[in-house]
Amino acid sequence: MIEITQPAQEAIKAAIEGAGQPVAGLRLMVQAGGCAGLKYGMALELEAQPDDASLTFGEVTVLIDPLTREHIEGTKIDFVSNLEGAGFTFDNPNAKSACGCGKSFC
């Protein structure tokens, strides 16, 4: 379904450990918005929803709702650090186009 690189897994694990409370995992979302029409979102989830896909990558659980699954099939998620800062990147083969920031697509 999706690929999460080792650096991304480590960043997610650090966020979960820093949450201060138990979480079910990291939710990946695709929402309307951004400069290209759709945008990626991520949030720590206290509990999974019944229709979520629950994927495990190492020590990290990722939750994905059915609508998001349609948009991110085959996506590679990475975490990069460079002179411009640090953050997650999404390489989505389903995106027809993307904006320069890499956070939204259509």
Swiss-Prot record:
Q: What is this protein called?
A: Uncharacterized protein in nifU 5'region
Indicate the transmembrane segments per the record.
Answer: none
**Would you identify the family this protein belongs to, as annotated?**
Belongs to the HesB/IscA family.
Source organism of the structure = Rhodobacter capsulatus
GO MF term (any one):
iron ion binding
Alphabetical list of InterPro entries matching this protein: FeS_biogenesis, FeS_cluster_insertion, FeS_cluster_insertion_CS, HesB-like_dom_sf
Tell me a GO biological process for this protein.
Answer: iron-sulfur cluster assembly
